[in-house]
């Protein structure tokens, strides 16, 4: 049987409603919810459209086989472009980069980037801030694995091989001083 995205490609003559009923019955939902799911034209169209679509590659990709319903078990690919910030003052850019370094959502990356921003951001030139801004637009786990030089998990792209900012981040991430890592305070007080 031919497959697309790991799902069987079924002839259109097979009843979509039958497959949807089989899936919904397995969920153990209330009768009213089950009735809605089985009789909703939106659900039928969603099922028909999502079942056979392939994926496209994008520069920045969030990919996850995220759903337990078989007809939704496919890769979800979203292309997220960073916001263009024209005429951003140097001070505003520094503050934004501090915020973006601290509020990533993954503890390991938060710790490394917040310490890096505290140590190096106040003395960065505009060009270095642009490079750091580009680095922050990468995925969190990619940044983390590049910072700790674990290229087996996430290979380092050519774009970052000669990066001075990434080299500084890697040097700081090595933690040769044996310092216990914690999120630095925003102000200068201890």
From Swiss-Prot:
Transcription regulation keyword on record: no
Gene3D superfamilies named among the record's database cross-references: Flavinator of succinate dehydrogenase
InterPro entries (UniProt xref): SDH, SDH_sf, SDHAF2
UniProt KW keywords: Chaperone, Mitochondrion
Taxonomic superkingdom: Eukaryota
Biological process terms in GO annotation: mitochondrial electron transport, succinate to ubiquinone; mitochondrial respiratory chain complex II assembly; protein-FAD linkage; tricarboxylic acid cycle
GO cellular component terms, semicolon-separated: mitochondrial matrix
Subcellular location: Mitochondrion matrix
Subunit description: Interacts with the flavoprotein subunit within the SDH catalytic dimer.
Function according to Swiss-Prot or TrEMBL: Plays an essential role in the assembly of succinate dehydrogenase (SDH), an enzyme complex (also referred to as respiratory complex II) that is a component of both the tricarboxylic acid (TCA) cycle and the mitochondrial electron transport chain, and which couples the oxidation of succinate to fumarate with the reduction of ubiquinone (coenzyme Q) to ubiquinol. Required for flavinylation (covalent attachment of FAD) of the flavoprotein subunit of the SDH catalytic dimer.
Protein family per UniProt: Belongs to the SDHAF2 family.
Note: This protein may be expected to contain an N-terminal transit peptide but none has been predicted.
PANTHER family, sorted: PROTEIN EMI5 HOMOLOG, MITOCHONDRIAL, SUCCINATE DEHYDROGENASE ASSEMBLY FACTOR 2, MITOCHONDRIAL
Name assigned to this protein: Succinate dehydrogenase assembly factor 2, mitochondrial
Organism expressing this protein natively: Komagataella phaffii (strain GS115 / ATCC 20864) (Yeast)
């Amino acid at each position: 049987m031919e497959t697309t995205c790991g799902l069987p490609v079924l002839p259109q003559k097979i009843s979509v409603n039958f497959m949807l009923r089989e899936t919904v019955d397995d969920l153990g939902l209330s009768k009213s919810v089950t009735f809605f799911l089985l009789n909703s034209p939106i659900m039928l169209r969603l099922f028909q459209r999502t079942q056979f679509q392939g994926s496209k590659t994008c520069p920045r990709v969030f990919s996850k086989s995220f759903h337990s319903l078989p007809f939704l078990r496919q890769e979800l690919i979203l292309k997220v472009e960073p916001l263009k910030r024209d005429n951003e003052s140097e001070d505003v850019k520094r503050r934004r980069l501090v915020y973006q370094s601290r509020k990533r959502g993954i503890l390991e990356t938060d710790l490394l980037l917040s310490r890096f921003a505290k140590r190096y951001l106040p003395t960065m030139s505009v060009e270095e801030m642009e490079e750091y801004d580009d680095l922050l637009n990468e995925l969190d786990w990619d940044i983390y694995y590049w910072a700790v030089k674990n290229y087996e998990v996430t290979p380092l792209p050519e774009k970052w091989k000669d990066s001075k900012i990434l080299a500084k981040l890697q040097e700081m991430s090595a933690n040769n001083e044996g310092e216990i890592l914690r999120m630095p305070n925003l102000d200068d007080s201890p």
